[in-house]
Amino acid sequence: MKIGIVTGIPGVGKTTVLSKVKEILEEKKINNKIVNYGDYMLMTAMKLGYVNNRDEMRKLPVEKQKQLQIEAARGIANEAKEGGDGLLFIDTHAVIRTPSGYLPGLPKYVIEEINPRVIFLLEADPKVILDRQKRDTSRSRSDYSDERIISETINFARYAAMASAVLVGATVKIVINVEGDPAVAANEIINSML
């Protein structure tokens, strides 16, 4: 399967846009799979007793986060190999804001394993992201609850995505998630992969 990595900071709407990507691809009868990098990491972290929920993973020591990243990359790469023709999209982050600084979400040992065709940066205005976070009470995102931090994280994500892309010859594409119409971003992502 061709792999596209869809990144974006918490609250930008990655999961919503990727749900729309799946819906559109199903309508077009294109084989597809959407995987969440964090789900792979979370399953391993919970098995090892490191965390009780997804949001605790950002606060783990960096060495433990790296271990979880490697396991997730291997699992996803295997899924893509076994998936045949079609498109596989990974829902993840280009950077993770941790207490000790920004952790690359797609470091060399991850990006080379996955070898994507495109790294997408799903973005929105920081004010819009903050509003979305406030509406989503199911998640704990206090470490991203300031416009300045959101802007800083978006910039670091751009730098990190380009650095990762250089290692595997992938392209990097910024896609704006328009408020109220995830189909716009979804179609832009799909068209970049076909």
UniProtKB/Swiss-Prot annotation:
Pfam families referenced in this protein's UniProt entry, alphabetically: AAA_17
Disulphide bridges: none
Gene3D superfamilies, A to Z: P-loop containing nucleotide triphosphate hydrolases
Chain positions recorded as ATP binding sites: 8-16
Enzyme class: transferase
GO cellular component, one term: cytoplasm
Entry's EC annotation: 2.7.4.3
Catalytic activity: AMP + ATP = 2 ADP
SUPFAM superfamilies: P-loop containing nucleoside triphosphate hydrolases
UniProt keywords, alphabetically: ATP-binding, Cytoplasm, Kinase, Nucleotide-binding, Transferase
Recorded GO MF terms: adenylate kinase activity; ATP binding
InterPro entries: Adenylate_kinase_AdkA, P-loop_NTPase
Keyword Nucleotide-binding set for record: yes
Record localization: Cytoplasm
Keyword tRNA processing: no
Main location: cytoplasm
Family named by the database record: Belongs to the archaeal adenylate kinase family.
Name assigned to this protein: Adenylate kinase
Organism expressing this protein natively: Sulfurisphaera tokodaii (strain DSM 16993 / JCM 10545 / NBRC 100140 / 7)
Gene name as annotated: adkA
